[in-house]
Regions:
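Aromatic-Pro/Gly-enriched surface loop or interdomain linker
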Residues: 187, 191, 198, 202-210, ...
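A glycine-rich, often tryptophan-bearing local segment used as a flexible ligand/cofactor-contacting loop or short
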Residues: 837-944, 955-957, 964, 994-995, ...
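Active-site microenvironments of hydrolase-like enzyme catalytic domains
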Residues: 394-399, 412-525, 553-576
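Short beta-strand-plus-loop segments that form exposed binding edges in beta-rich domains
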Residues: 359-371
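Pro/Thr/Ser/Gly-rich low-complexity, intrinsically disordered linker/stalk tracts
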Residues: 604-647, 681, 695-714
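Beta-strand-rich modules
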Residues: 676-696
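Active-site-adjacent mobile loop/cap segments within catalytic or ligand-binding domains
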Residues: 357, 364, 376-384, 471, ...
């Protein structure tokens, strides 16, 4: 009986099992097909918007009872910038794939536990999520009010406070026992310096020009000198006080610069005292404090003030910075940011102790009996003074004899070291109790943001400096290599969940996705989306039509996770990818990127705070300066239209004036595009112009100068034809590629702080091993602690000094004003054309023609007409002949050879730094004189890697100087119907001022005194 029963059970099993297996396999295969199709569709849609890896881990969660389907996928799905159109396409694809299997089901696609429709940014959505609108509604008085600015920002970033930092910096590695960069030297730079070259010259000034108060957890002044003036310290600098009704009194703990260097956890803001006094509303009762620095070297110095915040601090401490351009006033709200270094601006100071170069503080206020405090004032950036110990037992004071500093400018160091110097608690800058300085550095930045905002309306329960920070922005570049000459591109990162998870799920704790003020941390994703979109869109329209957008990551990065304000971590491009770096090294690209970030921040804050934004204008163009009488000058300029931003139209302009070698004044507002002013003879006047509107101020124009000789001598017109700024020359031969900085290092904007040294590994097949052996792109370190001079756009003054010494008058103009006809060359008997390192330069993939040509066709016509009418012309530049010369032609029938009577010789020769100045012609020096020009990177003047070697093309042309050690001509003069003098190196790069004066005097004597 049992056997029959067993057989029966076996039969039943055999009868039914195969059918069940088939059904299970069928269901499994069907599910795989569906998930595969969904993965294919999502990946295809994603790659129309961003560069995306395959979207895998698709899950189909079916609820048969409710007839709903929830679709989720891996992290890549969340990287999309969701928009109504791509969300509609996603849902359309999902319904198309699933409707046959699951008819009439409602589908919901989710990322991080949220419907993707909810992740359309608020500023693009019809359904606003008010929980993620982060705004400061408190009418806070801004930390700094600039009283001397001749215009007001009403539709920009006024009253906004932004925390900003430029990635990594020099830090001490306990593992290696030395100071190192956090990233390798690649393609002539390191990320630690590369991001700084965006933030300091471009992004920070743009934000401040829009009215924002900017906070950077690193030194922002590239001036390597530093002077501290303090009430506690007796130095050659002076601190003084005056008293009237109220007297200055000793305060509590404050700053004192007691040590040559500081070790962990020393705090210089706990080593001294501060001063305090009551405020007054009466002009007759004013008391003052005065800080007079002993400046070691004339130059631009950042001014930082220190004070303490007390219970009844004043909201309008009146600081006046006296500098070589005049006096600039500020109001500082001392109810916040006490006990640290507050940056006011950069100013020109003279060498030594000068009563015209100082800072004063007055107790005059709108409110009486508030408390005004005064502590140290810092001039300049200086060198790093935070020391470390090579032994891990560095907290033990017995080891302080082994302390060493970085020996680098402070701006090159990481945040950790600046924060210690700036009085920030060691619990902020050293989260690892000084046992891991690498981690301390990157972790400190986010906690510093919270320290800034602690006690303010945005972070009310925390201890801190009470600054109502609106947002934070971390500027990085990334690693990674992309083949086929493609761009790695731009990545945006936020962290929605502050518990350290790599997703937006709150694990049941909604507090994990809220800031301290109760606003949803999803606000950060909206901000990241907007700024990343602005960057990529602008780059596609100006530099590369296929610039890569990588996506929006919601991952746990300390810099994005820790701050209690919306924070973006930007990975702009890959510093390891040659194609990306061809753009990154170009100052114009840096300007475009920085302007895009500024616009993104502006638009984000405009949306969240419900105001109409206006973008600051672009710099003016076609600037000219000419005499209209013996004692008056007319300046003219034209606005620049911004094709990317309709609101960036100027309302008015500001003219800044400098007299002789002083500094620029605070500017005069001008409604039109011209300005007439009276001048005194015997003084050199210099001018620059900026455009302004309700959103802020543009970057300044080039600088033009003019001088009227007291005896009303002939006037020389200086034409500035040197407006080039560019990255270094590059090449790509498939098997070899890179940057040829020894041939043409490019031209920095004002200065360069990113150059470490020449590239020495050119093989793309050379692999990364470690930071000291990074493979393809590896570069030297010769110049990594140098601030390298670039194009200051101020060479009309330098040329003008020599013309003045030769006893002639001069005025100046941009070359564009000559081409446009605003300036008529025929009005002048002699012109001095500055070409510097002007050279045809290709950039980007949207520009079919080169920029910065030495002699564009329209200029050729103007110069030819001028010379044919008996004019006299001096031209100097590193590419004065070679830029226009077509080596494929055997004849000399081109503009340079026919007008200037020179042709270039092969540049691929040895570098010459010395010039022998001598000539047999009576108007030029017969006795030999040796001089040098700048041919290597330096701090004083842009350098010329390869000057032009000249050869005369006319029997009436003759050599006036030659490169030392050979017979190549460095300068050629011509005397015929007109007179011409051509120098194969820029005149302004001659190192010795007396030599410049001598050569200019000889040339002008040749022009004006010799017979035709």
């Amino acid at each position: 009986m049992k056997r029959y029963l067993l057989a029966y059970l076996i039969i039943i099993c055999l009868g039914f099992y195969p059918e069940q297996v088939v059904a299970a396999k069928s269901t499994s295969n069907s599910s795989k097909i569906l998930t595969q199709n969904i993965s294919d569709s999502l990946t295809a849609i994603a790659n129309t918007v961003i560069f995306s890896d395959r979207i895998n881990q698709v899950k189909i969660d079916v609820n048969q009872a409710l007839k709903t389907i929830k679709i989720t996928a891996g992290d890549n799905f969340g990287h999309l910038p969701f928009r109504k159109d791509n969300v509609d396409r996603i849902y359309s694809a999902l319904y198309s794939i699933l409707e046959k299997t699951y008819p009439n089901y409602i589908i919901k696609a989710e990322v991080y536990g949220r419907d993707i429709r909810e992740l359309i940014p608020n500023y693009l959505s019809n359904k606003i999520d008010s929980s993620r609108i982060y705004k400061n509604t408190s009418p806070t008085i801004p930390l700094i009010t600039r009283l001397s600015t001749p215009f007001s920002v009403t539709n920009g970033l006024q009253n906004r406070h932004v925390a900003l930092w430029n990635s990594h910096g020099r830090h001490f590695s306990q593992l290696e026992g030395k100071w190192i960069w956090q990233r390798p030297r690649l393609f002539t730079t390191a990320e630690d310096l590369l991001t700084t070259s965006f933030v300091l010259p471009f992004l920070a000034p743009m934000l401040e020009n829009a009215g924002a108060n900017i906070f950077i957890p690193r030194e922002r002044d590239v001036q390597t000198n530093e002077v501290i003036v303090d009430n506690d310290d007796k130095t050659t600098s002076r601190y003084r006080e005056t008293h009237r009704r109220y007297h200055w009194q000793k305060g509590d703990t404050g700053f004192s610069n007691k040590n040559e260097y500081y070790v962990y956890p020393e705090n210089p803001f706990k080593m001294g005292t501060y001063r305090q006094i009551k405020t007054t509303i009466n002009d007759d009762d004013i008391s003052t404090a005065e800080w007079v620095p002993d400046i070691p070297e004339k130059g631009l110095y950042a001014v930082y003030v220190a004070y303490q915040t007390t219970e009844n601090s004043t909201e309008d401490a009146r600081y006046t910075v006296h500098h070589l351009g005049g006096a600039t006033e500020f109001l500082v709200n001392q109810t916040m940011f006490g006990g640290s270094w507050l940056y006011l601006g950069h100013f020109l100071f003279d060498t030594g102790i000068n009563n015209d170069c100082k800072v004063t503080l007055s107790n005059l206020s709108k409110d009486k009996n508030r408390i005004l405090t005064a502590d140290a004032i810092k001039f300049g950036g200086g060198m790093g003074n935070i020391a470390v110990l090579q032994d891990k037992r560095q907290i033990d004071k017995s080891f302080t004899d082994n302390a060493n500093t970085s020996n680098f400018p402070r701006f090159a160091e990481g945040a950790k070291y600046w924060l210690q110097w700036a009085g920030v608690p060691d619990s902020i800058y050293s989260r690892n109790s000084n046992t891991n300085e690498y981690s301390d550095d990157f972790q400190s930045r986010g906690f510093w943001v919270n320290y800034l905002s602690g006690g303010s309306v945005v972070n009310p329960k925390a201890e801190g400096l009470k600054v109502p920070i609106d947002l934070a922005f971390a500027f990085h570049t990334d690693a990674g290599i992309s083949g086929n000459d493609s761009i790695v591109g731009t990545l945006g990162i936020c962290t929605v969940n502050n518990n350290g998870n790599n997703n937006g799920n709150s694990n049941g704790n909604t507090a994990n996705t809220l800031y301290k003020n109760g606003v949803s941390r999803w606000a950060a994703r909206d901000m990241v989306d907007l700024i990343q979109t602005q960057i990529v869109d602008d780059l596609k329209q100006t530099w590369h039509p296929e610039w890569t957008r990588r996506g929006i990551w919601n991952k746990s990065y300390s810099e994005a996770r820790v701050p209690e304000v919306p924070t973006m971590l930007l990975e702009l491009l890959s510093h390891q990818n040659f194609e990306d770096m061809k753009y990154a090294l170009d100052p114009r690209f840096r300007f475009t990127v920085s302007r895009a970030i500024y616009k993104g921040i502006l638009k984000h804050l405009a949306y969240t705070n419900n105001f109409e934004y206006v973008v600051q204008p672009l710099p003016v163009k076609e600037f000219s300066c000419k005499f209209i009488s013996d004692d008056s000058i007319r300046l003219t300029w034209q606005e620049t239209i911004d094709s990317l931003e309709i609101t960036a139209k100027p309302d008015s302009f500001i003219v800044y004036t400098r007299i002789n070698d002083g500094g620029f004044d605070n500017g005069k507002i001008i409604s039109g595009n011209s300005y007439v002013l009276e001048i005194e003879s015997g003084k050199i006047y210099s001018f620059k112009v900026s455009a302004v509107n309700k959103g802020g101020e543009s970057f300044p124009s080039e600088i033009l100068s003019a001088y009227k000789h007291p005896q009303n001598k002939e006037t020389v017109l200086i034409v500035n034809g040197f407006d080039r700024i560019s990255g270094p020359e590059n090449f790509n031969l498939i098997t070899l590629a890179g940057f040829m900085t020894d041939r043409d290092a490019g031209v920095p904007y004002l200065y360069d702080i990113s150059f470490t040294g020449n590239q020495y590994v050119f093989s793309p097949d050379s692999a990364y091993y470690d930071n000291e052996n990074p493979g393809f792109g590896a570069s030297k370190s010769d110049y990594e602690n140098m601030v390298i001079a670039g194009n200051t756009f101020d060479y009309t003054y330098l040329h003008g000094e020599s013309i003045k010494e030769a006893q002639y008058s001069f005025t100046s103009t941009s070359v564009q004003s000559v081409i446009s006809g605003e300036i008529n060359l025929q009005d002048y008997k002699a012109i001095d054309l500055i070409l510097g390192k002007q050279k045809q330069t290709f950039s980007g993939k949207l520009k079919n023609k080169p920029e910065f040509q030495t002699f564009p066709l329209a200029l050729q016509h103007k110069l030819t007409d001028y010379c044919n009418n008996g004019g006299n012309i001096l031209v100097s530049g590193a590419y004065v002949a070679s830029d226009m010369y077509d080596y494929s032609k055997e004849d000399n029938d081109n503009f340079v050879s026919s007008l200037l009577k020179v042709k270039p010789l092969d540049k691929d020769t040895i570098i010459f730094s010395g010039v022998l100045y001598e000539s047999q012609y009576s108007n030029f020096l017969k006795k030999s004189r040796h001089f040098e020009y700048y041919h290597e990177p330096n701090t004083n003047m842009y350098s010329v890697e390869k000057p032009d070697l000249l050869e005369s093309t006319d029997e009436d042309a003759f050599e006036i100087c030659r490169y030392e050690g050979n017979d190549y001509a460095a300068g050629v003069a011509y005397k015929g119907v007109y007179k011409a003098c051509t120098l194969g190196f820029p005149f302004e790069t001659i190192k010795d001022g007396k030599t410049r004066n001598l050569i200019m005097s000889d040339i002008l004597s040749f022009f004006f005194n010799s017979k035709p």
